[in-house]
Amino acid sequence: MNSLKLTNSLTRKKEVFKPNNIKKISLYACGPTVYDSPHVGNARTLVVFDVLFRVLKVLYNSNVTYVRNITDVDDKIIEASQNNKEDINEITNRVIKIFHENCKSLNCLKPTIEPKATEHVKEMIEM
């Protein structure tokens, strides 16, 4: 099998990627905070993780779970709601739709799972 080298942000050295479980690879990326139209920083993260997801799928025979969250509760969202006199759900739903359109335009694969923060508030509090 070909090896994949990634930069370890802790050691700042390139290291061979060695999964904990070769039969089940997990990849997590922080997705957007949906208070305003997506920007180039969101696109960069999308493309970088899309490439990594595709490479891991090839190297490990598609045994990759890619989770990318959507932060749909945040001070910036509340502020945008107040400034624009717009319901929080209207803002977040509109921006999520634009984000997904951008993902499609960039030809990024959909993540395996895309949870919203509001769907997991209880679990976050318990952590």
Per-range role (PLM):
Residues 1-127:
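N-terminal Rossmann-like or analogous alpha/beta NTP/dinucleotide-binding catalytic cores
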